[in-house]
């Protein structure tokens, strides 16, 4: 296997689509845990599905008909369920970067609590600007202290409610 002969010099993450099946998620998690050159997985990328948009009243019906990748808040629940499954499979043996629907400290707290070691933002940066990062970090830090945790690492995978 040529890939396993690579020396681990840089962190390498595999970014997965929210359309991934449970079977493929389990396979990729197992491969990632057993390959030295893979540091972790990124869950998840944009989706081409619009299914979650039909569940809410939509003032912007054009979003349902739009083609291309959908990102941001509509992905939050789907992404969270995939992160939770991956964490249960991997049991903390590889890093998980949570992506999709992170707009505030509560969203960040939830993703970390179900298993994400780190987070990636995009849509909230576009709509709220770079200060959203400070807002998220401040709220997250306050909530971690409120829950009696020493640091963010103590939250990873603990399934602690934000409320």
Indicate where each model-derived feature is located.
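Short beta-strand/loop segments at the ligand-binding rim of alpha/beta enzyme cores
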Residues: 5-18, 88-98
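Catalytic cores of alpha/beta
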Residues: 20-35, 87-92, 102-119
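Glycine/Thr-rich beta-alpha phosphate-binding loop at enzyme active sites
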Residues: 33-34, 38-92
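C-terminal helical cap(s) of enzyme catalytic domains, especially alpha/beta-barrels
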Residues: 51-68, 125-150
